Amino acid sequence: MCIRDSVGTGENGRIKRQDIENLITSENINSKTSSTPDTPKKNETSKPKDKDKSISRLRKRIAENMVLSKQTSAHVMTSVEVDYENVEIFRSKLKTKFKEENGFSLTYLPFISLATIYALSEFPTVNSSFDLENGTHDIHSHINLGVAVDLNQEGLLVGTIPEADSLNLKGLARKISETSKKLREGKFGLEEVTGSTFTISNNGSFNSFMTAPIINQPNVAILSTESVKKRPVVIQSQDGTDSIAIRHTGILSLTWDHRVFDGSIALLFLNYIKDKLENSDWLQGLE
């Protein structure tokens, strides 16, 4: 600050007290302004850009089928909880030997599939196709089981196991393994991905709790398997007393077409599967 540079406002240019105070104030403002660094401009080129990705033919087909199904069927979801302890005890005893002898794992899916086939035989309306425009409702004589297969997160295909009702537990396990392998490797024919009469989506393999799957047209229902976990449950002993036990449990979710049947059939169907899983003697299925 230089007082000599100040212009006095008093008589004959004399510097007054107010002139000095004004000069001090002016210097402080200039000092603050000069000491404040310029804010650097944001580098616009460093921002990540959106990626334009073309839709694959498979994804486009999946999208079309999903929208068509939601526009066609009256989707309703019903679920039950299953105690898998009966399955787990049997599976844990045999899974190591089974894989050594057959070259693939004995998972929960073949057990669920076989129980589902039993239920479809008992409730044939669930194993059908429905065409409202033409006024037809076809009850299928055979069970062609569709199994949804994830293609390593690149899409989804439904592999078909024709006449699955003619197979036992071991035969189903083998067919499911072979079909899944073919689809993932892209080594399949058209007949292996068409013609299903009922579909199972194995979401449990991805650690799901509950899923509402979309019906695979022209089926009238689809079953979603959910993850099997150890959970505390209340069990009743033979003398009628209750106790807490750790059991392998999981949810089964059925999405069904309310145009074709009602909730009573959906629940009877699901509880039939539940009963088979909880009480069947699985040993005969491997013979």
Regions found by a protein language model. Name each.
Residues M1-D5:
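Conserved small/polar residues in nucleotide/adenosyl-binding loops
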Residues E11-D19, L23, E27-E287:
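C-terminal catalytic/motor cores of large multi-domain enzyme assemblies
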